[in-house]
From Swiss-Prot:
The lineage of its organism: Eukaryota, Viridiplantae, Streptophyta, Embryophyta, Tracheophyta. It holds the Pfam family Ribosomal_L16. This is Large ribosomal subunit protein uL16c. Belongs to the universal ribosomal protein uL16 family. GO terms for biological process: mitochondrial translation. GO terms for molecular function: rRNA binding; structural constituent of ribosome. It is found in: Plastid, Chloroplast. It comes from Vitis vinifera (Grape). Keywords: Chloroplast, Plastid, Ribonucleoprotein, Ribosomal protein.
Length: 135
């Protein structure tokens, strides 16, 4: 699972996901990519599930790039705890994804294989996505 080695602060505000992604919205490494169409928090488990699904489908020959990284800690309070007594402890990590952001890239495979692998990875994501080709 992906997570930062260390951060300056243990806990973060939730923030809000306004507008579209201006960074990370172009294909840089591969030929095919999966692009987000909705804003969401994507957990490190979801990122890993998508990556594994793509790797299994492509087998050898193909190369996969994960273009998002979960760097935001999400805190959760213990169950049946009364209000007050501070913020909960960090439980898992999420990547903040805005519309237009590239999630995964792929290269070195035929288009039909890439389409199939990326569609399987897309089904693991909690948002609507689209398959795009560079050029």
């Amino acid at each position: 699972m992906l997570s930062p080695k260390r951060t300056r602060f243990r806990k973060q505000h939730r923030g809000r996901m306004k507008g579209i992604s201006y960074r990370g919205n172009r294909i840089c490494f591969g030929r095919y990519a999966l692009q987000a169409l909705e804003p969401a928090w994507i957990t490190s488990r979801q990122i890993e599930a998508g990556r594994r699904a793509m790797t299994r489908n492509v087998r050898r020959g193909g190369k996969i790039w994960v273009r998002i990284f979960p760097d935001k800690p999400v805190t959760v309070r213990p169950t049946e705890t009364r209000m007050g007594s501070g913020k909960g402890s960090p439980e898992y990590w999420v990547a903040v994804v805005k519309p237009g952001r590239i999630l995964y890239e792929m290269g070195g495979v035929a288009e039909n294989i890439a389409r199939k692998a990326i569609s399987i990875a897309a089904s693991k994501m909690p948002i609507r996505t689209q398959f795009i080709i560079s050029g």
